[in-house]
């Protein structure tokens, strides 16, 4: 029985994909696999039983990635599973910032008891007049799964779209509309665009990237949209930019005591991925990733170990090894198997930074003594027998 712990509520359509060999009611301490959404794991003690963690979503700043890698715990996320939901919110954010729909709705609520509200509306509506987004310039910082959908949708709405991403993948580039103008210097986004939306992970290099220096380059009346991570925007700097008029509206999906009181900000309660469809997609993708890893040893969409997919094992045995990305480890693994008279039918090895992953299909079952010998190799972190 494989024990699975859910640190947050996970959509039932995902959990039902587990076979009867899985117990999804396990405690965290006994779990071999964990499903998580937003629960903070940095202070949690990770047991020796734990093999994998799957984040039902894209961001993984709530998971201790380095600690997990050191202990041979593979961490997965679900890139793209909630992208359409976030795209929809970004489009809505642009409309909310352009047309004072919130103010108009509040006026109606405040005057709901007025018997002449219909007549009063014709005079009052002038206060809520806005502008269209068609023909305006949108800068998209980050062209991953979400950014590319936002860019393409904005093109369809008649906007002039500029995209910036120094690490854009070939796949993302192929999916991007040819009408998107690719920008090599993010400063040009700040200078040119009326609307700017950011879609990058929270890294040391991106924290506070939308700062005073960025605002100084922008046109007056710029709209900033942040449905990615709260730390990407320097809140003190954007507060000043709102007061000066450099920024017309800041739409944030991350309420806190600062943004909640910020005049000129539209702050939403972290709704970007909160659609039934997105939660279902994330749960299904996360469960499939866990099952593929537990049952086949394959790694797809890991954030701390390299991807390594050899399909379903067709030989008598399969061994997986999490290890340091250092010389001689591979040769020592093959030497141990050779000395035990075990032939390697096929082998895959991939590396990612300081860590590597090896998957070996063998023509005989590996006895416990061989597993112990493999585990004793310097640089080896975790050995697992799939079959």
Predicted features by range, described:
Residues 1-78, 211-213, 217, 223, ...:
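An N-terminal-biased, well-structured beta-alpha scaffold segment characteristic
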Residues 39-44, 166-259, 274:
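Rossmann-like adenosine-cofactor binding region
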Residues 79-137, 301-303:
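Phosphate-binding beta-alpha-beta segment of Rossmann-like dinucleotide-binding domains, i.e.
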Residues 87-106, 152-159, 285-298, 334-338, ...:
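Oxidoreductase and adenylate-handling cofactor-binding alpha/beta cores
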Residues 147-148:
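N-terminal Rossmann-fold NAD(P) dinucleotide-binding loop
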